[in-house]
Amino acid sequence: MTTQDFLLEIGCEELPPRRLNQLSQALSQTIKSELEKADLSFENIHRYATPRRLAVLVNNLALQQPQRKIERQGPSVKAAFDKDQTPTLACFGFAQSCGVSTAQLKVKKTKKGEFIYCEIEQPGQNTLDLLPNIIQSALKQLPTPKAMRWGDHKEFFVRPVHWIILMLGKDLVPATLLGKMASCETRGHRFHHPKNILVTKPDDYQKLLLTHGMVIADFEKRREKIRDLIQKAASEKGEAIIDEGLLEEVTGMVEWPVILVGNFKAEFLKLPPEVLITTMKVHQRTFPIKNKNGDLLPYFIIVSNIESKNPKRVIVGNERVINARLADASFFYDNDLRTSLENRLPKLGDVIFQRQLGTLADKARRIEKLAAFIAKQINIDEQLAARAGLLSKCDLVSEMVYEFPTLQGIMGYYYAFHDKEPPLVAEAIKEHYLPRFSGDQLPRNLLSPCVAVADRIDTIIGIIGINKSPTGDKDPFALRRAALGILRILIEKELSLDLFALLNEAKNNYAVELPNVNVVNQSFDFIIERLRAWYLEKEVPASVFMAVLASHPDDPLDFDRRIKAVQHFQTLPEADALAAANKRVSNILKKQAAELKSKTIDHSLFDSDAEHLLADQLKERAELVNNLYKKADYTKALSELASLKEPIDIFFDKVMVMVDDKEKRENRLALLSSLQQLFSQIADISLLS
């Protein structure tokens, strides 16, 4: 099959740097999807992205769709042939429209009866003709929630478009996209090579931009080059602190990276390192440098988009801005230190947490109570937990956090140390925001989780209590993230807490009456649903989750232990047979629920060895399993129960449960009920079948 390379480039004004890589991936994926939908084969796809362009190179794209066999259905057999099986006018007309003789027509049975049909070889369309619509369709699927219009164009895109390349091999694909006629010309660096560059064939695109246009088109290559240049430049002073998010953003801001090293006044090193790093990162997109001990040095790395003839001027400009920013930060910090965290509590009363739920001062007092309640459950100092909870939000009204919101908690940590609060309290103020996102680190000490869980539980109860639960993609109060944070803390830090009791306590701490009377149950269900989603991400089968859920554990850590026990149980050779047997038992007991008046087993009513064997084995295992259950050793408990496979199999082989004799029937049902209870106190194993 004949193939050619295909190139698409969309040249535009500067694209959002934080979303550039995502846009590039999406464009590549949508084009791939549309080509596959059109049945056009290709070898692979390369994507390119710089601040001024999105491009896709498709290698060895087929120049034509393959021939396809299509079936055309005609009239029914009754209409196509008369009583003598002679073709009718309808049959001749259909055959003529298909370009075949009546002898070439076939009969096919359908739900609506027998119909005649013909198979037609449909030639594939030329790729050159298909490409404009394919690209149009791909562009419509791009995630561009803030697309814009420009000039008098009706088209929308992320940024105004200035040029378009559409090439198949050496040929131009004639089309108009996003208001621009396609051409074979790209443009180089905005300052170093603003002139047009003729692309003679798609495969030369990346090389031409590099050698003629001073543009590194490949996003990944550009990012790694920047990383290498930063590390090399920093090595003369120390070691660069490379934030991956900032590196991604800077890669989206430059086409031709040039690395420069600047410095700031050493006197600013007295500021907390997080303040210095945030100032350099947020305001100037620069990378800090540290020494071998991890201490910050008064230097930073600048990633410039131009090879300046006077690099010193670029450095001085950045130094002037950073020194000014750090001078402001130093002023805010010194001002903040004049007021203790405790004395900031009244100011929290001026900040609304949520209109129906009161102020941040109200929330801080609720966290204080709930943190102490949690501390008592896990044998942590209640007074320290209460103190940390009370002060946890005080830094939100400091000048530093007002200027740098991402430093919430961190500044509270430094201010608490300055106020001579206990070190654990200071750490809890900083760590109670952890985890901030999926996969983030957890609080390190055991006091911090008390405040972290209390804060999140209070928010969940309050927001669900005023009937503002998340719906669809909308979660303005980040309740899903809060729920996942609670679960990760309790499970990964191995903290045993009754979630239902905790939610009740949180509800009672609210001074206002929450409109949602079912708030505790709904909050519990909401958190458990996040637990289900979490296990789904970990590829825990839904049947395992449902089996554990059926036993109604209120403690997330206990829930997790049961999950692991059931997963281990599934690896045992007896697992499938026992799951099937439990399902059989469950079905029998559901149908005969009315007859289970007494759950006492009467051995005198047994008339077979199989009944005695199962009853004896149950009694023997029950004591052992119940002791293991009390220790929460569910894995060993289920392993012990696996030994019941043989007596259960013998029982069902030899014994008829639903006999006419009522006493014997009810006694056998009681025996099966005891068997079910022994398993179900850990999980409903029948749901694994």
Swiss-Prot record:
Protein location: Cytoplasm
Keywords noted in UniProt: Aminoacyl-tRNA synthetase, ATP-binding, Cytoplasm, Ligase, Nucleotide-binding, Protein biosynthesis
Catalytic activity: tRNA(Gly) + glycine + ATP = glycyl-tRNA(Gly) + AMP + diphosphate
Family membership noted in the UniProt record: Belongs to the class-II aminoacyl-tRNA synthetase family.
Protein name listed in UniProt: Glycine--tRNA ligase beta subunit
InterPro entries registered for this protein in UniProt: DALR_anticod-bd (IPR008909), Gly-tRNA-synth_bsu (IPR015944), Gly-tRNA-synth_heterodimer (IPR006194)
Organism whose genome encodes this protein: Coxiella burnetii (strain RSA 493 / Nine Mile phase I)
SUPFAM superfamilies: HD-domain/PDEase-like
A molecular-function term among this protein's GO annotations: arginine-tRNA ligase activity
Pfam family, one: DALR_1
